[in-house]
Amino acid sequence: MKFTPPPSSLRGPLVIPDKIMMGPGPSNCSKRVLAALNNTCLSNFHDELFQVIDEVKDGLRYIFQTENRTTMCITGSAHTGMEALLCNLLEEGDIVLIANNGIWAERAINMATRYGADVRVLGGPADKPFSMTDFKKAIEQHRPKCLFVVHGDSSSGLLQPLEGLGKICHDYDCLLLVDAVASLCGVPFYMDKWEIDGVYTGSQKVLGAPPGITPISISPKALEVIRSRKTPSKVFYWDLLILGNYWGCYDEQKRYHHTVPSNLIFALREAIAQIAEEGLEPVIRRRQECAEQMYRGLQAMGLEIFVKDPEYRLPTVTCIMIPKGVNWWKVSEYAMNNFSLEIQGGFGPTMGIAWRAGIMGESSTLQRVNFYLYAFKESLKATHPDYVFEKKNGQTNGTK
């Protein structure tokens, strides 16, 4: 046998530097979560794996605040949650209304179009939420099968209120689907109380687990819609009836679907367990306190926040406006090279005009926030020596 020689790049050991991850995700994992990854990989049908899966389902119902039986995880990044909801609940020609004021709603528009849905769009500015009146008028006009809404948009730092929206949707026989990737466990979320029919979140964001596994939950009403489809879900991999069977949601004999990432499930279990041990209320309060400290520190530097109204700011992701004359990349590069701190740029509606600061995972402490503010200021001073930190007329802005 003759083979090409092995690549020289693999001759040395793997070296990954420690970094303080304070962008919009992924976040730093705790030592406990990372240790869970070192367990033995288990086979799909080992009893010990099913035991952990049951514990994860219990934890997910807690953080989603739901009693939905169809609560599970999908192998893949949080985009798989968006795909799964849309491809399971939409059939060719179904009307879906998407509230679009950020990059993730644009992704949903792209996906729903690919599934052959009749996509209608409720548009709005990236820094302001939709009102319940906006939603009601649009639902009355379009009569959609589903309404898709992003709860917390990591591309803008905007928080969209949801309370009361589920009832509006159900009054018009419409399902409410929610992206809670960047918001869950950073702000209050009540799936059952708010009458939400489908939701997913990201393991690598506020929860502080590794990426690659996506928690998702659907209501009995949504499950009924899926079961009554005229055609099977277009994507086998995201078929929630088959996935839910393996995750023990339907009182059926479990069947093989795909090899699940057992060690990611272990890590997610530990991340949720840490939240459960502290309690949702103190977990959320701590992140909100960290966000307030972030706002105060940025304002003291004369910097503006993209979302002007504090009521609608997402505590887990703050978009910081780039002052005129400042090269955002130089600041981010300096912070990484000198402080091992991630200061990430904008995305979607904030690309080129803002930085994004994350308060997620292990970085949800006042100590980390204060470090971020210190490193940010030092990086701005070092890369732009002429920049003047000041407030003008009570407004937060910087001058050069």
UniProtKB/Swiss-Prot annotation:
User: Which residues, renumbered to this chain, carry the PTM N6-(pyridoxal phosphate)lysine?
Assistant: 205
UniProt binding sites for pyridoxal 5'-phosphate = 77-79, 154, 204, 256, 259
Required co-factor(s) are: pyridoxal 5'-phosphate
Per the entry, what this protein does is: Catalyzes the pyridoxal 5'-phosphate-dependent transamination of both 3-hydroxykynurenine and L-kynurenine to xanthurenic acid and kynurenic acid, respectively, preferentially using the alpha-ketoacid pyruvate, glyoxylate or oxaloacetate as the amino group acceptor. The affinity and catalytic efficiency for 3-hydroxykynurenine is higher than for L-kynurenine. Involved in the detoxification of cytotoxic metabolite 3-hydroxykynurenine generated by the hydroxylation of L-kynurenine, an intermediate in the tryptophan catabolism pathway.
Q: In this entry, which stretches build a coiled coil?
A: none
Q: State the family it belongs to.
A: Belongs to the class-V pyridoxal-phosphate-dependent aminotransferase family.
Q: What pH-dependence text does the entry carry?
A: Optimum pH is 9 with 3-hydroxykynurenine and pyruvate, or L-alanine and glyoxylate as substrates (at 50 degrees Celsius).
Q: Which InterPro entries match?
A: Aminotrans_V_dom, PyrdxlP-dep_Trfase, PyrdxlP-dep_Trfase_major, PyrdxlP-dep_Trfase_small, SP_NH2Trfase/AEP_transaminase
Q: Could you name the Gene Ontology cellular component terms for this entry? A: peroxisome
Catalytic activity reads: glyoxylate + L-alanine = glycine + pyruvate; L-kynurenine + glyoxylate = kynurenate + glycine + H2O; 3-hydroxy-L-kynurenine + glyoxylate = xanthurenate + glycine + H2O; 3-hydroxy-L-kynurenine + pyruvate = xanthurenate + L-alanine + H2O
EC class? transferase
Q: Which Gene3D superfamilies match?
A: Aspartate Aminotransferase, domain 1, Type I PLP-dependent aspartate aminotransferase-like (Major domain)
Entry note: thermal dependence: Optimum temperature is 55 degrees Celsius with 3-hydroxykynurenine and pyruvate at pH 7. Optimum temperature is 60 degrees Celsius with L-alanine and glyoxylate at pH 7.
Key words, A-Z? Aminotransferase, Peroxisome, Pyridoxal phosphate, Transferase
Places the protein is found? Peroxisome
Residue ranges of the region described as Binds to and confers specificity for 3-hydroxykynurenine: 43-44
Give the protein's recorded name.
3-hydroxykynurenine transaminase
Subunit relationships: Homodimer. May form homotetramer.
Q: Name one GO molecular function term.
A: alanine-glyoxylate transaminase activity
- What gene does the UniProt entry assign to this protein? HKT
So, what pathway does this thing act in? Amino-acid degradation; L-kynurenine degradation; kynurenate from L-kynurenine: step 1/2
Give me the disulphide-bonded residues: none
